[in-house]
Amino acid sequence: KTTVFNCLTGFYKPTGGTILLRDQHLEGLPGQQIARMGVVRTFQHVRLFREMTVIENLLVAQHQQLKTGLFSGLLKTPSFRRAQSEALDRAATWLERIGLLEHANRQASNLAYGDQRRLEIARCMVTQPEILMLDEPAAGLNPKETKELDELIAELRNHHNTTILLIEHDMKLVMGISDRIYVVNQGTPLANGTPEQIRN
C-alpha cells in the first residue's frame, strides 16, 4: 500500500504502467514537481523538521510555491515581502485550524505525538493540495486523538475541496470517513466499494 503512495509521489518509479493526473504522466517526475501539481503526502512515521519551530515547518513547506527568486529575496522586494506575508498568514490560519497556534514558536520535536501528526497534515495543507495522501495517520494515536483526526479529515474533504487517499488499519475511522474503500492484503486487492458494500 505504501509502495503505491511512493510511486504516486515520485519516491519510486514504477516498473510498468502509467500514472496520470489530469492527463499528465507522473511516473518518473521528481517529487517536488508532483507536489507543485497538488499531490502531497504524510508518512507512516512522522516526518517533521524536528529542530525547527512549529510555524517554521509550515513556512518551509511553502517555499516551493513562492513565486519569488533569489534576487528578490536578497533585495527584499515588495513582491518577496508580499509572498512571505501570505505564507505566514496561511501558516497561522492552519495552525489555528489544528489547534496549535499557541505553540507556533515551540520546537516541533517538543509537541505531543498527536500534535505532531496534526502538524504534518497542516504542513501538507499549506501547499493547497488537490490530493492529500495520509499513510496510517491514526497509528499510535489514543482514542481522543483518533476522533480529532477523524474530524480533521472530514473538514479537509468537505470544506477544502481536497481528495484524501488514506492507508489505515483503524476500520472504525476508515468506515466513518470514506466514500470508497479498497481492501488490499500483501499487495493483493481483496475488495473495493462503498463502506456499506465492504461491510456486507
Regions found by a protein language model. Name each.
Residues 2-200:
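Glycine-rich phosphate-binding loops of nucleotide-dependent enzymes
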